C-alpha cells in the first residue's frame, strides 16, 4: 500500500545476475477531495476521517479502510445507495480524489397491481381509485433527491396511516437513461371500501 510503482532491472555482473529494485513511494497525503464536490458526504467529515493521515505517505490499504468508515456512516444515516470509490485520481502533490455516486432518485412510479400482481390491463397501466396527488402528498421521497431509506420508510408509514392501502411494496430499479440514478416503484394495494354489514 505504500508504493505507487516498482521497477526491477537485471544487470549481469562478475558474480552472476544482480537485481536492482527501484520503488516509487506514494506521495505525501495533503488533501482528500470528492467528485462531485456537492455530494451528500460533507468535505468536513472527510477531513475529520483523514486528518491524522495528512502529512504522511499515502498508504492505499489504510486509505481503503477509511473509505469503508465513510460508507458505513452514510449507510447508517439512511443513504444506502451512496457509493464511494477510488482513489479516482492521485496527484503528484498529494491530493486524492474520490468518486461519489449519491444514488439520485430519477422517478417515483406508483403502480396498482391486481390480485395476480399484474400492472397492465389491455396494454395500459392499471389505475387505482386513489388519485396520484393524494399519494404524492404523503411522500418526502421525490425525483431529484438523494435516496434515503429512513425517509422512504417514514413515507410508507404515512401511506399506511391514511388507511387507504392494505399493502405497500417498494422496489428499486436502475434508470437506463440516467446511469447511477434509481427509479422507485411503489406498488399499492388499496383497501376495499363500501362493505356493508347488518343484522337483526
Where do the model's predicted regions map?
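Periplasmic polypeptide-binding modules associated with outer-membrane biogenesis and secretion
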Residues: 1-200
Amino acid at each position: 500500500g505504500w508504493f505507487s510503482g516498482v521497477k526491477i532491472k537485471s544487470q549481469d555482473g562478475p558474480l552472476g545476475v544482480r537485481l536492482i529494485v527501484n520503488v516509487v513511494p506514494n506521495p505525501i497525503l495533503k488533501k482528500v477531495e470528492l467528485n462531485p464536490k456537492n455530494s451528500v458526504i460533507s468535505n468536513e467529515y472527510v477531513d475529520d476521517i483523514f486528518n491524522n493521515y495528512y502529512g504522511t505517505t499515502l498508504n492505499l490499504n489504510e486509505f481503503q479502510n477509511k473509505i469503508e468508515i465513510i460508507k458505513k456512516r452514510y449507510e447508517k444515516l439512511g443513504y444506502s445507495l451512496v457509493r464511494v470509490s477510488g482513489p479516482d485520481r492521485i496527484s503528484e502533490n498529494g491530493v486524492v480524489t474520490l468518486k461519489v455516486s449519491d444514488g439520485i432518485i430519477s422517478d417515483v412510479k406508483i403502480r396498482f397491481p391486481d390480485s395476480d400482481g399484474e400492472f397492465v390491463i389491455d396494454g395500459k397501466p392499471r389505475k387505482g381509485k386513489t388519485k396520484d396527488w393524494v399519494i404524492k402528498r404523503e411522500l418526502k421521497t421525490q425525483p431529484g433527491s438523494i435516496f434515503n431509506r429512513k425517509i422512504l420508510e417514514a413515507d410508507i408509514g404515512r401511506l399506511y396511516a391514511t388507511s387507504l392501502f392494505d399493502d405497500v411494496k417498494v422496489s428499486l430499479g436502475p434508470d437506463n437513461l440516467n446511469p447511477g440514478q434509481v427509479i422507485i416503484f411503489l406498488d399499492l394495494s388499496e383497501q376495499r371500501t363500501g362493505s356493508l354489514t347488518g343484522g337483526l
